[in-house]
A protein has these predicted regions:
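Pocket-edge positions in alpha/beta enzyme catalytic cores
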Residues: 17, 77, 145-148
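A C-terminal junction/extension of Radical SAM enzymes
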Residues: 135-178
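Radical SAM/AdoMet-radical enzyme domain recognition
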Residues: 2-14, 21-134
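Gly/Ser/Thr-rich loops at beta-strand to alpha-helix junctions
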Residues: 18-19, 138
Length: 178
């Protein structure tokens, strides 16, 4: 309520994993139906029941974390997570929900996650946007080997801009979050 008094009507929810509180999020979205909520999630807790509620409410959108195809994604996010995210995308598309992806790119996956094939797969799944975040070495599994070189970074800047441009046949709104 204080935020609305300040003129703020768009909220971004991040984690940990915000969907562990999905009942609270749905209650918040219903109470504040004049606001929009964008949720960054790993996608593993998205199910049919949630999709029906989100469809009914109409003021939530999602960014699902994905870091490449199954092997690459699951190496970083856990075994079977890629398939769960693909299933979540299928459910969201089936219910006409607004969603995109959140992609952490590294020196190992940056070409794959910006390839025509990968991006078209996301569009075919129903994604309309992709947030790109460069890898930051923090936490117990931090690795400086995953940092991009200046040349790789320049490639990402140019590629993300190209995909977002009208010259690209892939219709996906891309943002490189710096």
């Amino acid at each position: 309520t204080e935020a609305k008094e300040l003129g703020i009507h768009f909220f971004v929810l991040t984690g940990g994993e915000p969907m562990v509180r999905k009942k609270d999020i749905l209650m918040l979205a219903e109470k504040h139906n004049d606001c929009a909520f964008h949720i960054f999630t790993n996608g593993t807790l998205i199910d049919e029941e949630l999709c029906k509620e989100v469809q009914r409410l109409g003021n939530l959108s999602f960014a699902l974390s994905v870091e490449g195809y199954a092997e690459t994604n699951d190496d970083r996010r856990g075994q079977g997570v890629f398939e769960k995210v693909m299933h979540a995308m299928d459910l969201m598309k089936e219910h006409g929900l607004l969603f995109g992806t959140s992609i952490c790119y590294t020196s190992k996956n940056y070409k794959v996650v910006t390839s025509d094939e990968f991006l078209q797969m996301l569009v075919d799944k129903g994604a309309i946007l992709s947030w790109f975040f460069h890898y930051m070495p923090v936490g117990k599994d931090a690795s400086t080997d995953l940092l991009l070189t200046p040349e790789q970074r320049e490639y990402m800047v140019e590629r993300v801009r190209f995909v977002r441009s009208r010259k690209c046949p892939i219709k996906l709104f891309t943002l490189d979050f710096q």
